[in-house]
A protein has these predicted regions:
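Short sequence/structural segments immediately N-terminal
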Residues: 3-7, 21-155
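N-terminal signal peptide c-region/cleavage motif recognized by signal peptidases
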Residues: 16-18
């Protein structure tokens, strides 16, 4: 009987762990951590509308600010991570932030790094109705400018 309970507990634990990994639950660390290695990208991002997205949404005089706005105007829908920071597109970085992991793209992806696609951008940048989403070509161009600089990992 004890063995059956033990096996059931092991199976349930395995399912819980695999479900958590599949869901992509990775802790967010904030752009200041990313800046430690990605200084050029951070400096390029810092002056963009993405960086100021939370402030801009709060300053809007024609719309009331709500928690729903944070889905696109903050990272991880949290005022603790204001603006559209690195992890809004690349996923929570706690599990891939170490240089030993980041120097291997496949290892970084296995630890939660998301390589954004157009669909990633479309999560917020589609449609003309601001009650849903808005397209700002300026923001999309800023995204390209941020990633124009490549910092290869040191050898």
């Amino acid at each position: 009987m004890k063995r059956q309970i033990l096996w059931i507990a092991i199976v349930l634990a395995a399912v819980a762990v695999s479900s958590s990994a599949f869901a992509g639950d990775h802790e967010y660390v904030g752009a200041d951590k990313c800046k430690m290695c990605h200084k050029v990208q951070y400096a390029s991002w810092e002056g963009t509308k993405h960086a100021k997205a939370t402030d801009d949404a709060k300053a809007s005089t024609d719309r009331a600010f709500s928690a729903d706005c944070l889905k696109c105007h903050a990272t991880n829908a949290s005022e603790d991570l204001p603006g559209v920071q690195c992890e809004a597109c690349h996923g929570g970085g706690n599990d891939f932030k170490k240089m030993s992991i980041m120097k291997d793209l496949e290892a970084a992806k296995a630890n939660g790094l998301v390589i954004p696609t157009q669909e990633t951008c479309n999560g917020c940048h589609t449609g003309e109705d601001h009650s849903k989403k808005v397209v700002l070509a300026d923001n999309l161009n800023n995204n390209e400018a941020i990633h124009e600089f490549k910092n290869p990992p040191p050898k």
